[in-house]
Swiss-Prot record:
Keyword rRNA-binding: no
Gene: ncoa4.S
One of the record's GO cellular component terms: cytoplasmic vesicle
GO molecular function terms attached to this record: transcription coactivator activity
Function, as annotated: Cargo receptor for the autophagic turnover of ferritin. Acts as an adapter for delivery of ferritin to lysosomes and autophagic degradation of ferritin, a process named ferritinophagy. Plays a role in erythropoiesis, possibly by regulating hemin-induced erythroid differentiation. Binds chromatin before initiation of DNA replication and detaches during replication. Inhibits activation of DNA replication origins, possibly by obstructing DNA unwinding via interaction with the MCM2-7 complex.
Protein name: Nuclear receptor coactivator 4-B
Organism: Xenopus laevis (African clawed frog)
Length: 625
């Protein structure tokens, strides 16, 4: 009874209270047994409790609906405020662009007026100058043709306009009241009651995209877009925009479309199949089957449903649709790689072996020869050391300790052909000697000229680049013999090489012995079986006496190691002095320029270790595994 009293104080619906009162009335039937009376008594005691519980549930659902509506009102209020701000900001942006356009138009009109007035002023100034000349000539008459000039100038003056062709009036005209009215009446905030909202949602027409897809209309619930008339701005024809006509009425702002928040509206409505309705109507299983066929080429799913079975009715429960939504959500959460088919490609072992070299990492230093020490610098000049990079230098101890490595034969030519050091005081030819070669004012650098003379002097040439012994050789030279026809086609340097080989054969005894051995017939080297010991003894005695045998046997000569080693490729001084070809002056200058104009070569040799074998400097292809 306490529960009933507590519930009675709440605002319960009238229908439940009246039904409870009717149920509390005494029964009018008299033919009931005691058992029936006992059951009625229990039923009458339980009926008010169930009704109170139902009333409580209704109140709780109503409170939750009110709270949800309140929350939705807050969200809609924020949305409306954001829309108002966006609309106003867009129109402010339009006003700003309109302002910029008007300013540009004002500048353009001002520029056109100024150009027109400047042209008129130029014509007037030119005519004024003509009249000034005529007035000066009339005051001091020197010619008789002044009458014609005066008539021409007066005619031009009559054709010109003496007033400004363009007016200085320039003002801005704006319909301020219309702008104020448009701004004041722009936009409105409206709301709908619950009944009107349901009516709008029921009578709404779907969007054009959905209307063009009958499959969506027949099988899925689509929230329809509200069919709203366009505002006055968008309903205005294009001619009114061009003519800038004022609209007759202020445009009305219609309420935006608010989608339904009820989950029942988004689900498929249940309906009982009529007997005359065709059972071949597409159902939900068939719908998902069509979508699955579209995604078969993208998805290889392990959980494939049996899409071929079709149900005869179109009744589906809400639980089944929720399962479908859960499955679609699981598909959305899947990784993109699970949706795409990655074909299994078997790699060819030959291709792997070919492209393996491109995939491996390599370093450039692995292909270059490592420098062990820097003792082979040009002229034994120690290069400058950077304080920041002292720890990175490999030969720091060699340079600081002053160790002198034993120079090999390959380094001797570097020391011998080191560049001489010239002083500006000794070489400069100018009246006022320069302090450095960089400040030299001569046409050609004094340092280059001194270097050229030093090179010519080392080669045994005079200041003009001609050999000093050449004239003596030309005077003492005998007439040459007629060369064979083959040597006429040879290059002069080849002729010199051929003559030098003949001279070496004549001078070197070992080469002469070898040539004699080659020219001897093979019969002298063959052993004869019919020779007796007496004849052999005679030949030995003859061989001791004859000097020709000594020439034919180089083994009887004293051992000379130089005869068994190939001669050096360096050119002797004798061959240099006996060169017959005369070198031109421009060629000598070119050699001097190449020698002096490439200091990077010296830097290159300063970093190279010339004591190493030449084959190590050649490029070697990497080993193929």
């Amino acid at each position: 009874m306490e529960r009933i009293a507590c519930v009675g104080r709440e605002t319960a619906p009238s229908c439940s209270v009246s039904s409870w009162r009717r149920s509390m009335k005494p029964c009018s039937h008299t033919g009931l047994t005691k058992m029936n009376l006992h059951q009625d008594h229990e039923f009458s005691s339980q009926d008010p409790l169930s009704k109170c519980l139902e009333a409580k549930k209704e109140l709780e659902s109503a409170i939750s609906a009110v709270l949800k509506a309140e929350q939705q009102v807050k969200e809609n209020g924020r949305e409306v405020k954001s829309q108002v701000q966006s609309y106003i900001s867009r129109h402010l942006e339009c006003l700003r662009s309109r302002e910029v356009w008007l300013l540009e138009q004002a500048d353009l009109i001002q520029q056109l007026k100024e150009e027109t007035l400047q042209q008129q002023s130029q014509q007037l100034y030119w005519l004024l100058g003509q009249f000034n000349c005529l007035i000066h000539q009339l005051e001091t008459p020197h010619s008789t043709d002044l009458v014609h000039q005066i008539s021409v100038c007066l005619e031009r003056l009559g054709n010109l306009a003496l007033k400004p062709e363009e007016s200085s009036t320039l003002y801005f005209e704006a319909d301020v009241p219309f702008l104020r009215q448009a701004i004041a009446t722009f936009g409105s905030i409206k709301t709908l009651s619950s009944s009107e909202e349901k009516q709008v949602l029921s009578t709404a027409v779907p969007c054009p995209y959905v209307s063009q897809n009958p499959w969506l209309l027949n099988n899925c619930f689509v929230p329809a877009a509200e069919q709203r008339p366009l505002s006055g701005m968008w309903n205005t024809p294009l001619s009114d925009w061009l003519q800038q006509k004022k609209p007759t009425s202020v445009s009305q702002c219609y309420t935006p479309y608010i989608p339904s928040l009820c989950t029942q509206d988004w689900l498929l409505k249940n309906h009982v199949a009529e007997p005359n309705e065709e059972l071949s109507k597409p159902n939900m299983e068939e719908i998902w089957g069509q979508l699955g066929e579209l995604n078969n080429w993208l998805l290889q799913s392990q959980q494939k449903e049996n899409l071929e079975c079709k149900s005869s009715s179109s009744q589906f429960s809400i639980e089944k649709l929720e399962d479908k939504d859960a499955e679609s959500q699981d598909l959305e959460d899947m990784d993109l790689s699970d949706w795409l088919i990655s074909p299994e490609v078997t790699e060819d072992p030959t291709n792997v072996a070919v492209f393996k070299a491109f995939d491996e990492d390599y370093k450039i230093n692995d292909w270059l020869l490592k420098v062990e020490a820097c003792g082979n610098c040009c002229g034994r000049q120690t290069s400058a050391l950077e304080i920041e990079n002292l720890g990175k230098l490999k030969c720091l101890n060699d340079q600081i300790g002053g160790k002198n490595n034993v120079s090999s034969s390959n380094d001797i030519w570097l020391l011998q052909s080191s560049q001489p050091v010239f002083k500006p005081q000794d070489v400069c030819k100018a009246n006022e000697q320069c302090s450095t070669f960089a400040e030299c004012v001569c046409d050609e650098s004094c340092e280059k000229e001194a270097l050229r003379k030093w090179l010519w002097k080392r080669e045994g040439k005079d200041k003009n680049g001609v050999l000093q012994k050449q004239r003596q050789n030309l005077k003492n030279r005998e007439p040459e013999k007629a060369e064979p026809s083959i040597s006429m086609w040879l290059h002069p340097c080849r002729r010199d090489a051929q003559s030098s080989t003949q001279k070496t054969q004549e001078c070197d005894p070992s080469v002469k012995h070898m040539m004699d051995l080659v020219e001897t017939p093979l019969s002298k080297w063959m052993a004869k079986s019919n020779l007796t010991e007496e004849k052999a003894s005679k030949e030995t005695t003859q061989s001791k006496c004859s000097p020709q045998a000594e020439t034919l046997s180089p083994f009887h000569l004293p051992l000379n190691a130089a005869n068994w080693v190939l001669p050096l490729k360096t050119v002797d001084k004798l061959e240099k002095s006996e060169q017959s070809a005369i070198e031109d002056k421009w060629l000598l200058r070119k050699k001097a320029h190449d020698y002096y104009g490439l200091p990077s070569v010296c830097d290159l040799f300063a970093c190279m270790k010339l004591a190493a074998d030449k084959e190590k400097w050649l490029y070697q292809s990497p080993l193929q595994m």
